Regions:
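Short coil/linker segments at helix-helix boundaries
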Residues: 17-50, 59, 70-129, 136-178, ...
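Flexible, glycine-rich surface segments
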Residues: 218-228, 232-237, 241, 245-255
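TPR alpha-solenoid repeat register
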Residues: 63, 133, 182, 233-234, ...
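A cross-kingdom marker for long, charged
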Residues: 240-280
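Bacterial N-terminal signal peptides
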Residues: 1-12
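Short solvent-exposed coil/turn linkers within tandem alpha-helical repeat scaffolds
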Residues: 56-60, 127, 175-176, 228-229, ...
């Protein structure tokens, strides 16, 4: 995870088609429910759901990794980081005021990541190709990258975690290409770094970074279409990408679907209203 097409089948009224029905988050497990609550900005409820899953499945590192994600998302929301104009204007984002993170939230975030990493490392020591453990490690690295970049504004340090997440994602996808959530890590690296000026991209390639913007979009699209826990997040990133490319129709379709699926998250509806007002 790190921030940054038409998906009519995802945003059209009516039930999801069979190929996508399994991808959509349900409330059938505490883990699924927690992600739904997190995307709906119901953070306390999400923490309770993730805690329940962690108690039921202490050997699953996705539980504490998901809990860490809820701490990060709640902090981004509290600090007002999730504002479209900042993401669409690189200079404005870089020049934004220095943020004041909550120490207690940071401590809880770090503890959740430490639990996830400890459990994942134990699983991988016994089974090096365990998909859930690898996915949890990818999420852990992505969350650390997001915190460094979006809250602390330590972009170079963030890039190191992004690169490590991309390498692990490639490893997981080589083992099992059906882990569609993992495509997001590779897609983010390509897309975000692909936006840099050509000399910067050349330098980043020397250090092993992937900087193909179009390939990044393709990877994000795979998660947005077929992912599970990270599917809504990938759709959000694609909406941001569409707005950057002045493709308002595409952004509107993605946002409409997200607004229907997560009505408590006013971020989607607010930007959708702005787009509709701009057309009048």
């Amino acid at each position: 995870m790190a921030l940054l097409f038409l998906f009519p089948v995802l945003v059209a009224p009516g039930p999801a088609p069979p190929s996508l029905a399994r991808a959509i988050l349900s409330s059938s497990t505490p883990l699924d429910l927690g992600f739904r609550q997190m995307y709906n900005l119901q953070f306390e409820e999400a923490h309770r759901s993730f805690s329940e899953w962690e108690q039921l499945h202490p050997d699953d590192p996705l539980g504490p990794a998901s809990d860490a994600a809820a701490y990060l998302f709640s902090e981004l929301e509290r600090l007002g980081v999730l504002r479209w104009k900042l993401f669409l204007d690189d200079e404005k984002f870089k020049q934004a005021r220095r943020l004041a993170p909550d120490p207690a939230t940071r401590q809880a975030f770090d503890k959740a990541l430490a639990r996830s990493e400890q459990v994942a490392d134990g699983v991988l020591a016994r089974s090096p190709q365990d998909g859930n453990a690898l996915l949890a490690k990818i999420m852990d690295l992505g969350l650390r990258s997001d915190y460094l970049a979006l809250i602390e504004k330590r972009y170079l340090a963030s890039l190191g975690y992004t690169k490590r997440a991309g390498i692990l994602a490639e490893k997981l996808l080589a083992i099992d290409p059906s882990y569609y959530d993992a495509y997001l890590a590779v897609g983010i690296e390509n897309y975000i770094l692909g936006l840099k000026p050509a000399p910067v991209r050349w330098l980043l390639r020397i250090y092993g970074a992937q900087t193909d913007k179009d390939q990044g979009i393709d990877r994000l699209r795979l998660t947005a279409e077929k992912g599970h826990y990270l599917r809504p997040f990938a759709q959000l990133l694609l909406a941001v990408a569409a707005l950057r490319d002045k493709d308002q129709n595409q952004a509107r379709e993605l946002l409409a679907g997200l607004a229907r699926e997560f009505p408590n998250n006013t971020l989607y509806q607010r930007e959708l209203d702005r787009l509709q007002s701009a057309q009048k």
